[in-house]
Amino acid sequence: MESLLRQLSICNELIAQGSCTAGHIDWLNDFCATFLDFASELKAHLPEVAPRWPAEGGTNIDVETIFLCLTQVVTCITQLERTINIEGASARATPMTRLHFLDRIDWCVRRIIFCLSQLHLQRANDQSNSLEDHTFVELMDLALDHLEAFMETLANTTPTNLLCIVEENELQLGSIVNHIVRHALAFANVALEADKKALSELCETLLSECATFLEDSGELNPGHRKLEGLSLERALYGLETYLNEALLHLIFACIVELENTPISKLRHAPDSEFTEQLVLDFDTNMDRIQQIGVLAIAFSQDIKTKTIVRSCLASLESLDACIVPALQSSALHPHHADILEHHFNEEILIFRNLIHEIIDSRSLINNYLDMLAESIHLAVKRPPRDHLLIVQMGSVLEEHFRLPVNYSELSQLDGKRLHTDFMLILSECLAVVSSPLGEPKRIVKRLKILYSVLAKLRHAIDRNKYVHEDSSASVPNVSSRRQFTNATRTLLRMKSKSKRQRSFVRQRRDCLVPNPQNCSISNSISHQGDLISFQLTEILRIN
């Protein structure tokens, strides 16, 4: 521990030198070498100082924070390297840019020191995670495990012992449900208007069922208690199922908003009123991205994926406070604005890529088909802009299948042919809805064809998935009731875990989903830094 803290202290001293003119590429290499030594030693000792608590269903929050900080330091090193190179080429200093990334590195180093100290204390005191440290999915599992244990005990106990069973679990189950509702309401705050009310009502139902279950703890009728337990379980699954659907709705809307309103628009806003609306829309979308990321972390089973999503969210959160002023004053500080905009686009690209990896393809298609069916049903009453929006949402599916891991689900010949048909009809729909002379009948006809092709594509994915499941069938470790109800989860849990085991570098190189017209972003992503930066990325791979 002392050796680790000593290396971090040296890192802090080097960070202080980075803001001055002496902070050139040699200084950055010195910092990278020191941090590399620290990361190598930490990687060797982390299993000793950071035990897991498997009974709680997750890793320790301090360990996850250390992983996040390591990834953030590497990200900021890459951006500092780019900043120094731009300064050298233009012979013009960018102190604000340096300070932005140095402050982030400094915060991460200080946070690593704090987390290492916390891990040392936890190990000495045998502490465990609190409910505040659990994700939505982990809390759901805890609540369902409590109910499952209650049901099993209920079947094997006498009425006189029933009161003791409930008193033992009552306080913790109620607290778990309260934390589940907090997560759900935090998401509801940024959800689409159509989903906010439903989520709020489902939260109220869950709280009501939980209160009934706990208030009747003195009830000695096992049959009555079982019905109350089943009602609470149904309320939990009802909230989880709808939250999944609302999350997919939000992902469609959020990605379309990113395409329609790129951050670069803030550079050339024509007037203050238009700028104010752009900033408001930008802030709303950033809040939505944060909540999408939080739930993506909850559903992901791979710690590498969790860490990279957290890193993207951390980068976007730190940029949120400074990128708008930087773009609005880009005439005075062009390099500062360019570097921050590049960094923002890069992080958004990685984030979108990871979200598409986590989402189950069939669930995404199902969600879009529901929205498309509603759009077709109300086609006559809806304005042309709504038709354009639903077709643009179809482009999210096009983006989804650009990833090799998702395209591989179309391995059957029919799947690839239907994917080609989908791309063709989607482009036709976009042309029709974009035309000022588009007739409602023509629009509806194209949308119906799009629906038909996507429904067939979904069937092809199902058929391919069933073939793989039949060839590798195994006996599950959960009850049949739990297995059936867990099928409502629409994200990573429904995907093969083997598809997730890919390194950080490979995710950023081979699985991009940029707009084909936007070559600048894809080129910048594939840019390699110096050898030290590459070695850091390699050594910080999380096992």
Curated annotation (Swiss-Prot):
<dbReference type="GO" id="GO:0016342">
    <property type="term" value="C:catenin complex"/>
</dbReference>
<keyword id="KW-1003">Cell membrane</keyword>
<keyword id="KW-0472">Membrane</keyword>
<dbReference type="Pfam" id="PF05482">
    <property type="entry name" value="Serendipity_A"/>
</dbReference>
<dbReference type="GO" id="GO:0051015">
    <property type="term" value="F:actin filament binding"/>
</dbReference>
<dbReference type="GO" id="GO:0098609">
    <property type="term" value="P:cell-cell adhesion"/>
</dbReference>
<dbReference type="GO" id="GO:0008013">
    <property type="term" value="F:beta-catenin binding"/>
</dbReference>
<comment type="function">
    <text>Required for the cellularization of the syncytial blastoderm embryo. Involved in the localization of the actin filaments just prior to and during plasma membrane invagination. Sry-alpha together with nullo and bnk may provide auxiliary functions, by acting both to stabilize a large and dynamic microfilament structure and regulate its functions.</text>
</comment>
<dbReference type="GO" id="GO:0005737">
    <property type="term" value="C:cytoplasm"/>
</dbReference>
<dbReference type="GO" id="GO:0007349">
    <property type="term" value="P:cellularization"/>
</dbReference>
<protein>
    <recommendedName>
        <fullName>Serendipity locus protein alpha</fullName>
    </recommendedName>
</protein>
<dbReference type="GO" id="GO:0005912">
    <property type="term" value="C:adherens junction"/>
</dbReference>
<keyword id="KW-0217">Developmental protein</keyword>
<dbReference type="InterPro" id="IPR008837">
    <property type="entry name" value="Serendipity_A"/>
</dbReference>
<keyword id="KW-0963">Cytoplasm</keyword>
<dbReference type="GO" id="GO:0016477">
    <property type="term" value="P:cell migration"/>
</dbReference>
